Amino acid sequence: MKYAVKMPKVLQAVYPKRLWSINTADKVVYLTFDDGPIPEVTPWVMDTLANFNAKATFFCIGDNVRKHPDIFEQLIARGHRVSNHTMHHVKGWKTPLVAYLREVDSCQNLMELEAGQEIHKLFRPPYGQLRSKQAKALQKKGFQVVMWDVLSADFDTALTPEACTKHVIDNAQAGSIVVFHDSKKAWPRLKLALPEVLKYFSEKGFAFKCIP
């Protein structure tokens, strides 16, 4: 499995309209969680974040919102940001433009229906896969495409929790957007890595905020 834990600057420069990190001098890290909400993991994530007075951005799969609206509503009630991760976690490189936009719109409409309010238009493409035409069409619809600059790689079953923790501690800095997953696949690594990351950066004087 090939991926970059620290997103190369050259790749960020190629796609400057995508959000890779937040330009700030403040000691803030932006934690993000992909693929929820699910009852097995997401409530624990919320409780763990609360122990450190931390807020985060959750990129939700629409079908999981449909299945677990109560957990989705808890995310909003507890001050986290909920954002779009398509309806069914589709791959951008294999999905035609019209079908891809339908996936995004369906997720956005469902979230707004469940929330009873407008949802800020942040979008993260599943697997990080997004064609230029898809990105341009989403931007025309008012979406900010959010990528990341640090990957915990908690999805990688070959890794130990300690390795995932080290990925974040060694690479995150002020303004970093960090990826975790509130999924059953990531859980064996997430349950140990997330508290350690929160503890480490809290002791360094960092705060954890939602992506604005």
What is the role of each PLM region?
Residues 129, 134-171, 205-212:
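His/Asp/Glu-enriched short active-site or ligand-binding loop at hydrolase and phosphoryl-transfer sites
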Residues 73, 100-104, 159-166, 191-195:
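Charged helix-capping and loop-helix junction motifs
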Residues 60-65, 88-91, 128-129, 151-155, ...:
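Short histidine/acidic/glycine/proline-rich micro-motifs that form metal-
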Residues 2-93, 99, 106, 110:
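Active-site beta->alpha N-cap acidic-glycine motif
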Residues 14-24, 51-53, 66, 188-212:
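C-terminal domain-boundary segment and adjacent tail
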Residues 46-55, 81, 97-129, 136-140, ...:
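CE4/NodB-like, metal-dependent polysaccharide N-deacetylase domain
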Residues 30, 57-59, 83, 124, ...:
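Structural detector of well-ordered beta-strand residues that form the stable sheet scaffold
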Residues 42-43, 69, 97, 135, ...:
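Conserved strand-to-helix beginnings and helix N-cap segments that scaffold or border functional pockets
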